[in-house]
Each structure stands twice: as structure tokens, then as C-alpha cells.
Amino acid sequence: MAQKLWEKSVQVNKDIERFTVGHDREMDLYLAKHDVIGSMAHITMLESIGLLTKEELELLLEELKNIYVAAEKGEFVIEDGVEDVHSQVELMLTRKLGDIGKKIHSGRSRNDQVLLDLKLFTRAQIKEIAEAVEQLFHVLICQSERFKDVLMPGYTHLQIAMPSSFGLWFGAYAESLVDDMLFLQAAFKMCNRNPLGSAAGYGSSFPLNRTMTTRLLGFDSLNYNVVYAQMGRGKMERNVAFALASIAGTISKLAFDACMFNSQNFGFVKLPDDCTTGSSIMPHKKNPDVFELTRAKCNKLQSLPQQIMMIANNLPSGYFRDLQIIKEVFLPAFQELKDCLQMTTYIMNEIKVNEHILNDDKYLLIFSVEEVNRLAREGMPFRDAYKKVGLDIEAGNFSHSKQVHHTHEGSIGNLCNDEISALMQEVVDGFNFHGMEVAEKALLGR
């Protein structure tokens, strides 16, 4: 069995080991590729300051590339008795290269190593989330344009209120995603700073070149203060979680709308039959399980910032093992949100809308405000017009036109989808994904 990196003469109690390692081996598989990338940058820097020879660097880089390929293929495993991904990589290098493999940890602690891994993993995941959000955004904008002239009831307090349109409905969620992407961009900028070189949280007496590793890894800048670099553990995850929760909040609300509008009592939209499920007892059922599960998953994701906060909020400066637990709730969250985005994008592209909803007599009063406004435009004081229409409704004498006259920005007749699309493009252009991709490919020689 492999010896722990920190193990000396005292044998570790097996129950203590099981408890302290917890789910780390499982969670660290998310980080394997990124741990290798971080090590490649670190040893390249070590060679530049004389702690590795050029020949040692070449041997280590070649073997790290092999480990990276194994991780890409899903073949990387953390062996029993090995605590984490960092220990496993060092063990594999030492088995293959002997004492050379033992040199890669110079000037580094597992504290800054895992923090680096988390940042490399997170920024890659943010890129995938941003791309998925952008895909959903474009579907919603296209549907908004396609159905911009199709009216639907607008509700307040779940009571019939005023005319709306499918153009407004689809477009509203598109614009909500723009604001969500602002949160994601802020999270990315916080994430895209280099903590490597902070070691255990107090730096190193080795003459490390942190600017070099920042460049090699494609970070925008450093976490300069080594104490703050470690204080950022938990804070970075929490702020990214806020961004994920913001997106999840939009998707959850959209899922609720879709479930409700798909029901027979509303009948505004129809989900594709192949996206619904049946009942074991009621043969007529077509249940919107996909959106119900999406709603639940997104509601769970909205609790993520609070979970992280409760783990990290009462810790003083310095590293504490409490932070390990954050990985268990944080790392799987990205795939869960990506799944929800993928399902929502597919269904929103295929959803059918009822183009004749307002022909139903129960929506007669939805045009009352239009009638009030018509009278006001003709010169009647607004309050008098409001009272007249209200009395007509009470007396059962209300008559109306189904024409709507909304021309201001963002209304039924002027959706401003081009402006909303421009806002989204501005946010998308603000992510520096290209820099990180170029840097990582250069390290891998691809």
C-alpha cells in the first residue's frame, strides 16, 4: 500500500483514515486532468529557477502527458490507500521515473495545489455552462420572434390580468439569462486568478516565479497575497455557486411556467409527446416530468450557495479541512445544471403554442385596460375611463376590441430582441476563454 505524502513512522488508524479521506478519492476524479495541467506549469517553472534539470523536466512532462490522456479517457484511478489525486499523480511519476517524480512537490503544498485544481476545473466548467446558456438564449430569442404576434393571457396573482404575447414570454426568459451571465462572468473573473505559489498559505522560501505560472496557465492575474489566496478557498466556490443559482432560478421559473401552461386548465402550450411520461393507472396521462425534475434540480442548485456558506463562514484565515466537504456539493453541480439547460433547450425548441387562446370567452376581461386606454386617448380623464369600464363590467355591458396598441420599448409591439441579443453578445465577449484554452493546449503540446 502506498505511503501517505505526510506519513512518517506512525501507522494511521484505519477508521480515522476512512473518515478523513471521506469522498475525496471520488471527488478528485473531477480534478485529475486539471491537477496534471497544474503540475506541468509548476515543474516548467521549477526548471527555470534551477530546481529541475532540463532532462528531468522533459521526462516529467512526457509522463504527465500520458497521465493526462488516461484521465481524458476516464482510465485514471486513485488507488486504495492513496488519499487524493495529488498523491496518486506523484506516486505514478515516482514509480515510472524514480526520484525525479519526488521532486514535483518542491515549492508547493496540497493546499495551493487543490485550490489551483479547483480553479482550473471551475473555469473550464464555467465555459461549458456559458455555452449552454447561450444556446438556450438563442432558442428563446428565435421563438420570441417566431411568435411575436401571437397573444396570450398575462396574469398577476394568478388572476387574468392583461394581454401578453408568446414573444414577450420567450423573450423575458432570454433577457433573464443575460443578467444571469453577468453573474457568471463575475464568477469567472474571480476564478481566473492564479493561487499557485501560495503553498500552505504563507508562501515559500524557494524563489518561485508566480508570474510565469500565471502566464503558462492562461490566468488573467494572480491572487497576489498568499494568505488571501488560501482565504479565497470557499469564497470562490460560493460566488460561482451564486452564479449557478441565478441561472437555475431562471430555469426553475421557466419550468414551472411550462408545466402550468401545458396543463389542460391553461392549454397555452403543448410539450412534445416524446418529452412526456405516462401513468401506470391512467392511460390518458402525458406528464411533464422533465420540467418537474428540472424545477426540483434547479431549486436544489439554488440552495448551493447557502450550503457552501454554512461550511466556510465561521473559519478564520488559514487552511482547514472543513473546506474539503465543499467539493462534495460543488463539483457535481455543474453537470446537474448542464443537464437542465440541455433538456430545457431541446424542449423549448420543440414546444407548440396555442395561437387561439384568447378566443375563449373567459379571457373577455383581459382587454379592459386596452378599453380604458382607448377612452383616455380620446380625451376622457384616465380615472373616469377606468370607472366607466369598471361599471360596464359590473353591469355586464363591457364590449371591447381585441386589438392591442403597445409600441414602447419592450412591449408586445416592440420586443427589442435585437437589443437584448446585443446585450448577450457583449457579455459573451467579456469572457477570456480563449486565453485559458491556448495556454493549456501549449502545455500539452497540442
Segments and roles (model prediction):
Residues 2-38, 99-100, 267, 282-446:
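Glycine-rich cofactor/substrate-binding loops
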Residues 119, 123-130, 134, 141, ...:
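Short amphipathic alpha-helical segments with heptad-repeat character
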Residues 42, 63, 67-70, 92, ...:
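Generic, well-ordered alpha-helical scaffold segments in large soluble proteins
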Residues 60-61, 217, 262, 273-275, ...:
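A general structural motif at alpha-helix termini
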Residues 146, 183-186, 190, 219-226, ...:
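Conserved helix-loop functional segments at active or binding sites
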Residues 1-203, 208-214, 221, 277-278, ...:
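A helix-coil-helix interface module used to build multimeric assemblies
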Residues 105, 110-113, 157-164, 168, ...:
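Alpha-helix capping and helix-loop boundary segments enriched in small/acidic/polar residues
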